[in-house]
């Protein structure tokens, strides 16, 4: 494969006129033999591409319908010239556009040649033409005539205004001779009635503290509402001294207890709260041992309920002894 590529390259270089040795082994960094591409370019005769050429022409040599074949070369005037006579928006050369035939009814009009963007200064545009000076004088005359008409209109408006001002006081005098009936204003509404005084507080022997607190709270709320209507103010915080002021005069009713309430209730075996309380008492009995010894030394009698209490069905006595509780009690007593 490599040999075939070498043979192909030798054939190509022989056809061009370049030796293989000079291409591969010549390492000159200058001249036309610096690279293979430069060598091929110097030996091959390449045809240059055609370039665009622009030519400036005068008005006399522009295209005309009588001489369609002349001035075929594109110029700078043709670059931005757009044909708008047929409603088209595409850019074309002036040589490709044909003028429309003139109508019979309309008189021939001289069209303005297409405008060109010329960067060279034009001496003809610097001098003002006599036609433009005449047009400016006519415009000034028209403006002065309009100003005179405006001044006359202003004078007429001022006369009309003065006549209206003179007629208005005379009409006012005529109106003043007629009697004018004045309607009296409506009387103001009567003031609101004052709030009723609070009822006197009567203490009954059967009233309780809750009733007194409720009454005082209602009185305070009613007084606060009246104050908010007249003078909106913030309500003060309730004072316990005012609430408990008449507590000494309150008499409590004696309540008779039934025999069932006096007797101690028997402990329910199925009550979980009682079982848990009894278990906790048994568990933490060693903590109150020192207190019980002190009470025995002082001679404080034990309550009969403890002595006559029945043994609990649930507690640490139902568990098997492991010896850990005794060790704990001994450690606590030693400490």
Curated annotation (Swiss-Prot):
Tell me the residues on which Phosphoserine occurs.
119, 129
Localization in the cell: Mitochondrion
Instruction: Tell me which Gene Ontology terms the entry assigns under biological process.
Output: aerobic respiration; mitochondrial fission; mitochondrion organization
Q: Name one GO cellular component term.
A: plasma membrane
Task: Give the range of the organelle targeting sequence.
Answer: 1-48
Any Pfam family matching the protein: Mito_fiss_reg
Is Mitochondrion one of the keywords? yes
**Ranges of compositional bias, category Basic and acidic residues:** 295-305
- Pro residues bias: where? 182-201
Does the record's keyword annotation contain Mitochondrion?
yes
Segment Disordered: which positions?
Answer: 94-135, 168-201, 286-335
In which residue ranges is the amino acid composition biased (Polar residues)?
120-135, 168-178
Give the coiled coil ranges.
131-167
Region (Necessary and sufficient to promote mitochondrial fission) location: 178-306
Q: Which UniProt keywords apply?
A: Coiled coil, Mitochondrion, Phosphoprotein, Transit peptide
Family that this chain belongs to: Belongs to the MTFR1 family.
Describe the task this protein carries out. Answer: May play a role in mitochondrial aerobic respiration. May also regulate mitochondrial organization and fission.
What is the protein name stated in its UniProt record?
A: Mitochondrial fission regulator 1
Species in which this protein is naturally found: Rattus norvegicus
Gene that this sequence comes from: Mtfr1
